């Protein structure tokens, strides 16, 4: 047993934690805004945002105050009761979206699990039990439960766990003919990320999403938008589907919703929700007062003209800085994404060294993510300061200099 007085080190992870992760060598102990500090006091500028989670940066004072105040009132009740923070949050999310009903959970995987179950349940009740096929897309990612990871289009995450859930097929992203070859009257849902995050920060084409909507209407199929990564202001609108002017039947959100506190939600219409009765689905912690109070404050801050328009401005600044860097080093083939979900596509001869580039970046004090095998992903705070953007890009520049001057 490790006492509180014993120094905690990265080595403790290897001895104590199930090795499903391989954390970077240092341990962060403090964060403020878009900067974090490790045990040795070294400072880093965070462009990872906890994988698009810390939408308002680290330890935002309003979120701190909200959490502290709610912790003095109610922590947990279970869904034998409802609670005021959950109902207030529900009102705000529903009034800002297409939806009329909402279900709260704790993670993106749980929200997607609920969405897939709802789609099958609705179709079995309204049509017939054979209408249960779910169409997803190659390179998509929808969570780590066995159902959601099977729906996801990356077999490396779902292989070797035994028989997979049946009735799941995969089409090629942005290829409507691929969907046409799979969809039929036994299909209950098509689920799509409007930007494939884990798959490489690849946006869905407008014509592709329009055609998906029409196909779903033709076959009485529910259209599910997975906005776990793009939702809650990440792209400069509260929900990314607003850019397409196309509404889904079911929407899932998480990550930015809690600003770092675990919460997710599934939103849907009165029509789809009409088949649900008590006991059909559930959660112990979902919609708890602490999470919902924090998420309400997140929405109050983000769902404003100042913050949402600021996302676009910050995005343009980052992309401008990246273009300057690329003009110097010529390592990128493309910079893509929307708002503050940005993908830097590396040239083929560079992408094999993507982790070396990230390690050089860490040594310079700037944190990035990967997306796929050849993309550096940026998903910083939606309110990251321009000073942090400029300094972060300077550090990235120095990291690339060192990468190019390295000796193998």
From Swiss-Prot:
It is an enzyme of class 2 (transferase). Transmembrane segments: none annotated. CDD domains: OAT_like. Keywords: Amino-acid biosynthesis, Aminotransferase, Arginine biosynthesis, Cytoplasm, Lysine biosynthesis, Pyridoxal phosphate, Transferase. InterPro entries: AcOrn/SuccOrn_fam, Aminotrans_3, Aminotrans_3_PPA_site, Class-III_PLP-dep_AT, PyrdxlP-dep_Trfase, PyrdxlP-dep_Trfase_major, PyrdxlP-dep_Trfase_small. Pathway: Amino-acid biosynthesis; L-arginine biosynthesis; N(2)-acetyl-L-ornithine from L-glutamate: step 4/4; Amino-acid biosynthesis; L-lysine biosynthesis via DAP pathway; LL-2,6-diaminopimelate from (S)-tetrahydrodipicolinate (succinylase route): step 2/3. Binds 1 pyridoxal phosphate per subunit. Its EC number is 2.6.1.11, 2.6.1.17. Its cofactor is pyridoxal 5'-phosphate. GO terms for biological process: L-arginine biosynthetic process; lysine biosynthetic process via diaminopimelate. Belongs to the class-III pyridoxal-phosphate-dependent aminotransferase family. ArgD subfamily. This is Acetylornithine/succinyldiaminopimelate aminotransferase.
């Amino acid at each position: 047993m490790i006492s509180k007085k014993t120094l905690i080190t990265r080595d403790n992870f290897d001895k104590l934690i199930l090795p499903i992760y391989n954390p970077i060598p240092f341990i962060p102990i403090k964060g403020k805004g878009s900067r974090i500090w490790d045990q040795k006091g070294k400072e880093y500028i965070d462009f990872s945002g906890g994988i698009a989670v810390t939408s308002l940066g680290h330890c935002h004072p309003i979120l701190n105050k909200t959490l502290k105040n709610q912790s003095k009132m109610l922590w947990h009740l279970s869904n034998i009761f409802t609670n005021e923070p959950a109902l207030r949050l529900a009102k705000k999310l529903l009034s800002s979206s297409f939806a009329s009903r909402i279900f709260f959970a704790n993670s993106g995987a749980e929200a997607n699990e609920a969405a897939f179950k709802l789609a099958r349940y609705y179709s079995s009740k309204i049509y017939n039990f054979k209408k249960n096929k779910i169409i997803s897309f190659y390179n998509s990612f929808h969570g780590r439960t066995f159902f959601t990871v099977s729906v996801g289009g990356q077999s490396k995450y779902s292989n070797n766990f035994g028989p997979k859930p049946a009735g799941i097929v995969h089409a090629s992203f942005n290829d409507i003919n691929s969907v046409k070859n799979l969809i039929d009257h036994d299909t209950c849902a098509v689920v799509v990320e409007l930007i494939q995050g884990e798959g490489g920060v690849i946006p869905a084409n407008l014509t592709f999403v329009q055609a998906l909507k029409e196909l779903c209407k033709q076959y009485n199929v529910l259209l599910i938008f997975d906005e776990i990564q793009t939702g809650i202001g990440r792209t400069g609108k509260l929900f990314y589907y607003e850019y397409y002017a196309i509404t889904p039947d079911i929407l899932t959100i998480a990550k930015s919703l809690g600003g770092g506190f675990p919460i997710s939600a599934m939103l849907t219409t009165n029509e789809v929700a009409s088949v649900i009765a008590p006991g059909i689905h559930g959660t112990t912690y979902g919609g708890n007062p602490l999470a919902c109070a924090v998420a309400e404050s997140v929405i109050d801050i983000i769902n404003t003209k100042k913050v949402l328009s600021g996302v676009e401005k910050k995005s343009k600044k980052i992309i401008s800085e990246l273009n300057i860097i690329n003009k110097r080093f010529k390592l990128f083939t493309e910079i893509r994404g929307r708002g503050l979900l940005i993908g830097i596509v590396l040239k083929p001869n560079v992408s094999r060294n993507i982790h070396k580039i990230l390690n050089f970046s860490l040594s310079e004090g700037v944190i990035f993510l990967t997306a796929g095998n050849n993309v550096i992903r940026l998903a910083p705070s939606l309110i990251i300061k321009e000073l942090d953007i400029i300094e972060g890009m300077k550090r990235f520049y120095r990291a690339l200099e060192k990468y190019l001057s390295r000796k193998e």
